[in-house]
Each structure stands twice: as C-alpha cells, then as structure tokens.
Amino acid sequence: MKLLSVCAIALLAAQAAGASIKHMLNGFTLMEHSDPAKRELLQKYVTWDEKSLFVNGERIMIFSGEVHPFRLPVPSLWLDVFQKIKALGFNCVSFYVDWALLEGKPGEYRAEGNFALEPFFDVAKQAGIYLLARPGPYINAEASGGGFPGWLQRVNGTLRTSDPAYLKATDNYIAHVAATIAKGQITNGGPVILYQPENEYSGACCDATFPDGDYMQYVIDQARNAGIVVPLINNDAWTGGHNAPGTGKGEVDIYGHDSYPLGFDCGHPSVWPKGNLPTTFRTDHLKQSPTTPYSLIEFQAGSFDPWGGPGFAACAALVNHEFERVFYKNDLSFGAAILNLYMTFGGTNWGNLGHPGGYTSYDYGSPLTESRNVTREKYSELKLIGNFVKASPSYLLATPGNLTTSGYADTADLTVTPLLGNGTGSYFVVRHTDYTSQASTPYKLSLPTSAGRLTVPQLGGTLTLNGRDSKIHVVDYNVAGTNIIYSTAEVFTWKNFGDSKVLILYGGPGEHHELAVSFKSDVQVVEGSNSEFKSKKVGDVAVVAWDVSPSRRIVQIGDLKIFLLDRNSVYNYWVPQLDKDDSSTGYSSEKTTASSIIVKAGYLVRTAYTKGSGLYLTADFNATTPVEVIGAPSNVRNLYINGEKTQFKTDKNGIWSTEVKYSAPKIKLPSMKDLDWKYLDTLQEVQSTYDDSAWPAADLDTTPNTLRPLTTPKSLYSSDYGFHTGYLIYRGHFVADGSETTFDVRTQGGSAFGSSVWLNESFLGSWTGLNANADYNSTYKLPQVEQGKNYVLTILIDTMGLNENWVVGTDEMKNPRGILSYKLSGRDASAITWKLTGNLGGEDYQDKIRGPLNEGGLYAERQGFHQPQPPSQKWKSASPLDGLSKPGIGFYTAQFDLDIPSGWDVPLYFNFGNSTKSAYRVQLYVNGYQYGKFVSNIGPQTSFPVPQGILNYQGTNWVALTLWALESDGAKLDDFELVNTTPVMTALSKIRPSKQPNYRQRKGAY
C-alpha cells in the first residue's frame, strides 16, 4: 500500500510554500504535501494519521525509553542499554544532546570520542531501535544550565526567545548537531525517525512574548536547513496545545506533551495523591491536535532527587511496578500511539554535568539502574506491558471511549475505559475509581463481543482487581486467525509457529480468570494440574476458567496452546526477534514480530538468530537458570547459548529445555585503605609564599549578565571570565589600614554549595551548605591586622552546576556563580582587588577528551594531577582515611590493578563511610573522569557506581580524591572501599575502554 508523506512544515525551509491536502485511507485521514516531488522524499519512510505513525508504510506504535548518551561516557556500553530496552518490547529510544558539552567555547563545536553521536546511531541500528532526536538547543534534563553552555550568561539577550543575540548564539551548535542527526535519519539508512525542536516550550513570564511563533519557526528552520526531513514533534510540558498543528507560525508536525502525574516526593513513596491520575488526556488531544497520533513524549518513569533527598531507591519505590500497571495502562486507555518513558536508563552526572538540584547519580529510579541492572521489578512489569503492545497491532485501530463506572463492571468502585474496535478487536482498561485504593475488589464484566453481550465470568466465580493494579481485558482478540472472544487474564504475547500457535496469559496472585475461544475443538490440559480449573464447550466456543497458580498450565484448543501463568512466572519470559545472523537485530515490524520466538530464561535474553541447523541465543544469567525455548524453528536441531553448544530435551509440547549453570567467579578487589596513597596540599593559595600573578584578574567594570546587576565594584561573576564548572577560587588583595575587623561575603554556587574563607593563612570559617540555599551571606571576624601590611582573602566556592531555564523570560540560567557582594568593615569595597580561577583555561579547557565541565579550579585539577600517572613519586605518602587535621583541601592519588574475568558484567562501586563528624566534601576521580561528588553533611549519596570502560577491568587504574575539610578540626574519610554486586554471566561483547589520556605537564598551568 502506498502511503504518502506529510509535512506540516515543508521538508526543507526552501520548500515552505505549498498547502496540505487530505486523503482518506481505510477510513483514516492522512496528511501529505501537495507537491508530488516533495512527497516522494518521505513516502516510504515516516508518515502518520490520527491513529499512529507509519514507518516504511507499516502502522506502528512507538514505545520508547529515554536514554542520554552523555550520561554514560562509554560508547561500547550503549549496545547493552539498547538491547535491554529492546527486550522490554520497545522499539524506540529518545535522547537529548547536551549543548554545554559540545560547544564549551563559543564557535568551537566538538563532538568526538565519548561525545560523538554517530556511534550512538550505529548501535541503535544494530539493536533495531528507532531514535527520537532531541538536541534542544534547550533540554532542561536536570543538566547544568538545562544544557545551555555557561557562556550564554554573557549573551545580551533573553534566552529561548527571538532576541537576535540569543538566536545567533544557537546557530553554530544547531547547524552542526542537526546536520549530524540528519545523516542518521531513516532516509539515509539511519535510525532517526523523529526530531524535536526546543523542549517544553510551555510557559513564560517577565513580559516575554509567548508563545512566540517567530522563535519556534526559527528553531524549526535551523533544523530543516541542516537537512532534517523527518517529522517534527514537540513536548508541551502539559496539555496546553502550544505549537500544535494548525496554530500557525512555529507549529510542529505532530503535537506531543509530557506528564509526571505522581510528582517527585520520593520521601513518601507509598503516597499517591488524590486526583493525580490523568483522566482528560483523550478529550484534550481531540481539542488540540485531532489529526495527529496521540503522543506522550515524556511520561514519568522515575523521579529526580535533590541534595539531601531520600535517595533513588525511594524514587524507584515511588514510581514502581504498581505505578506502571495503573498509569501506563491508563495512558493506553487514551490511545497513546507514541509513548516515551523518562527515564528508562538514567546514568550518571559525571564530570559536573548536572544542575544544582541533583547530585552525581542520575539513577532516577528508572527501570534500568544506574549500573545497568535489570533487577527492579518495574523492569519486569514494563516488559509485560511492552510486549503486550508489540503483539497487539489492533490496539492502534481501536477508538478510545469515555471512562465510566457503569455499563461494563458491576461495581462503581471500578472504572472502565473502552477502546472499541470495528471488527479489529477491543480493549477494556479496568482500574479502581479511587486510583489510590489498596483494596481487593471483586467484580464481573458485561462485555460486547462478536458472540453477543456476555456477562463474565460465565462459569461462576468473580474476577478480582487487587489494590493499585489495573487490567487490560481483550475482546475479539486475533491470535493468527483464532478469535479470542474475551480474556480476563492479560496477554503477554502470542506467536504463530506454523504448525501451532502459542498464547501466553497471566494473572496476579489470588485471581480467578476466564477466557473464551472461538474454536470447535475440545479443551485439553496438556501440562499442569486440572485442579481449580474448569472448561465448557458452548457451541463453537470453548470457555476456560482457572485460578491463578505459580504452577504452569498449558491448555490446548485445536492448534492453539494457551500458557496460563502467574505474573511472577511470566517475568522470566522473553520474546526475542529471530534474526538472520548475529550482526544486528531488525527494527520492530510485522515481519520481525511474527518471526520472534519465546524463551524462558530468567535474568535477560538479548538476541536470537539461526545459523545453519543451529539456534543461537545470547543471554545473561545471575543464577543457575532453567531455559526453555518455545517455538524453535523446524529447520534447527542444535542450541547454542552464548556460543556454547548446549544439550537440551524436547517435551511432548515441542518445548526445548535445558539448564545453564551459574558459578560466580571470585572477585578480588583491592583494599582502598591499603593503597600506596600519595598526598599533595591542593589549597596552596593560602600559603604566604603563593604567587597568583598568572591568574586572571577580576577587573571588569561591568557585567554582560543581563539578569543580575553588579553589587561589587568589579564583576566577580565567574562566567564573565569563562569559568562555568566545579570549584572556584578567589583571591582578594588589600592593604590594611588597621580598621578592618569583619568581612561579610555573599557567595552563590547553587543548591547545597559550600564555601570557605581564609585571610592569609588564617582560617576564617565556612558555609557548609544546605540544599535550601543557593547562596549565603557569611560574616567572619578577622584576626588583628596591621596597618600598611598586604593581606589576601582566599575564598573557595563549590559550584553545583548552573540553574536550568525552564520558564521562558526568567533567564534563570544566568544566575551567576561566585561572589555576589562583600564588605570589609571600615573600608570601601574598591579597596580589594580580585583575581579568580576555575578550570585551567576556562573555555579554552585543557582536556578535550573528558570535556569542558569535568574539572574545576583546584591546584591539582589545574595541573592535571587527577589524570593517570601524575608526577607523584616525590609526594608525601598519606591516606585520605588519615585525612587533614585542619581546614583545607588535600589531594590524594593512588593506582591499583583489576583482574575481573571476561564474560562477566560486574558492577563496581566506590563507597564512602557516612560521617556525622565535621563537614567535608570529596571529589572522586577515576582514570581522570570525575565520577563523584560526596558531601558528608548533606548527602544522600555515599555509593558511586563507576562503569567498566571508565574503570579498566583488566589492567591498571588511577583513583584520585580531593578532600575539602570545611571546619576547624579538619576531616578524614570514615571509610572508603571498592565493592561489587552480583556478577552477571553476560553475552556482552568486549568493552572497549574510553580514552583515558595520562598526565602531561600543562603549558601555562599555575
């Protein structure tokens, strides 16, 4: 069938002229460009109607997970994440690009090594995953500046508006990044099928024009001019209808919105607030964008967590498997055709890339943990939903109806939303009317079916909806030509294996279920017990009823085998596509879905392919695991698991069975406390002999920052001088007149920041930080000063990233870092002359491999001593567990070897002992990558996962710590250790380490 392409905005900016016309196809409206030549460009790739996207002419539900490649700086691990998302039944990944990491200096775009996008596209294609590209320029994303580079603080214009200075500042970045994305589009054989200009462009204040069609059109034109031809989609922060098709200038092709309905209160993970379940999304969609598929571009899959928060384990408990059952099935009840879950894999805010509202971990409570584990129950639950949608193409043809408490269920305690098919199958989404309910509610259903309206169960008993659960009951569900008249048990998947069909159904504990199949054959139980089971033949319909049990039953009706499972059992089932070879996995399509097999195998099944007479599975195991293959192709005779030929048995139902033995290797990790630690004082700036003549002078009379006027004689805003990340150090020189007794200083570093102040070598005090304080005014008493003598104030500030810029017009990202104001008693402010430093070179940053944000302004960082093989041979031997006896900062470095056996995925963590003693701050560097900021008095993070590829699992590693003692009695680490969690026997390919350039003497380092 020929499908013609659509462009609400022309395929290229030069093609903007030309009206749209409408066609009808199978009763659905398609939009297409009026110029046939322009239609041809996309006709066989990506089109859409009001029901769904079409990719290569095939209607497809986009089930997507959010992944940020910049939060996992090991490109050879990206395939692992993609395969784990593919195994969920998903077919797409959405990704942000962080501008701040690619254009650290205005006009110099660098997207190489860990920051290159092409390898990300390559492994997406290898895994058979489509991509939704979201390069901003603004991304939010809990990233420093919301993805804006720090030098935008100097732009004389309002951010995210039509202000010419801002637009010009974005041109270089978008021209480059969009051109790279364009090369990865499906039109060029790549995986990119959608492109999102801007991000959550949904609200403004402060007299900013909003919505500004000229601005959005500019961002759109930037993309089109760079070669973007796939459809453009947006993510309104709520159902506001902003920039939807038909709104005029700046409209996108497909309207989408975001939703985080449960909020972010991880401190109360069991609390579901009243009224937070969306109920109007369908009617909102019909008002705002009825000609496009209903699209949820960010739907909640976890939560951020602030400094001092309860931790991401609590966030995973808040947005858990029960949340998924209730909220994601609710999304499906609205007819969601593009559903992207934020985040599906969170990763790490390594190298200072996060904003002040979060700490190093960006685990997010996601289905995949920060260390890429799939052990959370929410991953398994999501796999049930994802594979159901993948196996149910008629879902996209069903029309969502209005939710109701009558007409379907026999109790008003339950709400049912119908999705009615026109001879193509119907779906009934059942939930508690009070969605927060934890009650178990019995019910019966009245269902309209091809056999008439039926009251279910027909064979007696009642159905049960347990608390915080939801069901999708199918009606007239097509299983390869066999009509399932209804099933109250939920569908995991089904397959047609030629000589037989398989349907897998499941239910929760304590539930009773029933299904009816349009088939003349008798019902046979071919595996499992007949107890708590009954069946009845009614004409040409077989009705089966059973109580859910942990023991598997297989029922055969004609050529259909129906597996009756409990939910915990089906968690162990996987549906890998059957590929032609081991080089790549095909994109999800009718063909690849039909060719899939079913494998029961525990922890993870990655891929399946045939070669000659062999069936090859790649899978991971974390325990001795029984393995079953259901639907092995008739032309294969041998089974290979992770390349090893494996003996198996075949039972009477044609199921292959074997067992994979698991014997964890002994992982011997070095004791961190026993390493040969070398120590260097890295706050040499407070020594009386220190010379700061090479430092940049803070001598600007004015600031280009348009947000906050100066309240100091010279600008002390760090970004005015090109310093946007990590620790800042200021040195203020003055000649005393003897009247100076106190020093007031207001510093700003973002939430949970800290600062310390010295006068010459005398420690004055510290602000140890609170999450609630982005800035703080401190007053310090000075020791007696001598008239006519030179003094130096040294101020150390830990910056926590730049603010995001979510509300247009606030220019919140321009909130400066550094010193906002100060007062030296008895003196004019101009009596002090200032110098400052951050990372060496500022925007001319030294380490092009690890990027512009990785290192800050400490002496050891400026010298590059945090990198492997520093010149530490003559340094003092001292351990961070002995620590410092007075305020200051110590730098510690050591090397160690690892010998982790290949073939095992072994997550490693650096753990700090949690102290209630004096406040201190630690930066953790691993092979030159900053992989942790530990704040002892705020927390919550004490455990820092570091992936293979940053750590060398077979070879030498360097670890470095900066220990900042903020109080007068100094500080030491209570404990510091390297630990592992359960080794996973893995089919992962060999992990190539990210580049780890060693220390080299830096020209001009001070």
Swiss-Prot record:
Residues 1-18 form the signal peptide. One of its GO terms (cellular component) is extracellular region. It catalyses: Hydrolysis of terminal non-reducing beta-D-galactose residues in beta-D-galactosides. One of its GO terms (biological process) is polysaccharide catabolic process. The keyword Hydrolase applies. Disulfide bonds join C205-C206, C266-C315. Cleaves beta-linked terminal galactosyl residues from gangliosides, glycoproteins, and glycosaminoglycans. Belongs to the glycosyl hydrolase 35 family. This is Probable beta-galactosidase A. It comes from Aspergillus fumigatus (strain CBS 144.89 / FGSC A1163 / CEA10) (Neosartorya fumigata).
